[in-house]
Amino acid sequence: MERTNNRKVLTGRVVSDKMDKTIVVTVETKVKHKLYGKRVNYSKKYKTHDENNTAKIGDVVRIQETRPLSKDKRFRLVEVVEKAVII
């Protein structure tokens, strides 16, 4: 029997990497308001497990839902989509 993978995959930007093996990722979504039809921006922060400390502040990353790893961590880093440009 084959199991399906229904875990959420989100793309966002790293806003903090000060913790060991943990990053904070902000995911922004645009939703159309039901009554007025205006597009509204929402953002949410997710604490994410980063095993090798590869992601840095400003990087665009892809994260995936996983089992609870701690009190706040429910996501893990899948890949770094785009590295931040340091000026």
Curated annotation (Swiss-Prot):
It comes from the Bacteria. InterPro entries: NA-bd_OB-fold, Ribosomal_uS17, Ribosomal_uS17_bact/chlr, Ribosomal_uS17_CS. Pfam families: Ribosomal_S17 (PF00366). Gene3D superfamilies: Nucleic acid-binding proteins. GO terms for cellular component: cytosolic small ribosomal subunit. Signal peptide: none annotated. PROSITE patterns: RIBOSOMAL_S17 (PS00056). Keywords: Ribonucleoprotein, Ribosomal protein, RNA-binding, rRNA-binding. GO terms for molecular function: rRNA binding; structural constituent of ribosome. GO terms for biological process: translation. PANTHER family: 40S RIBOSOMAL PROTEIN S11 FAMILY MEMBER, SMALL RIBOSOMAL SUBUNIT PROTEIN US17M. Part of the 30S ribosomal subunit. Belongs to the universal ribosomal protein uS17 family. One of the primary rRNA binding proteins, it binds specifically to the 5'-end of 16S ribosomal RNA. This is Small ribosomal subunit protein uS17. It comes from Exiguobacterium sibiricum (strain DSM 17290 / CCUG 55495 / CIP 109462 / JCM 13490 / 255-15). The lineage of its organism: Bacteria, Bacillati, Bacillota, Bacilli, Bacillales. The gene is rpsQ.
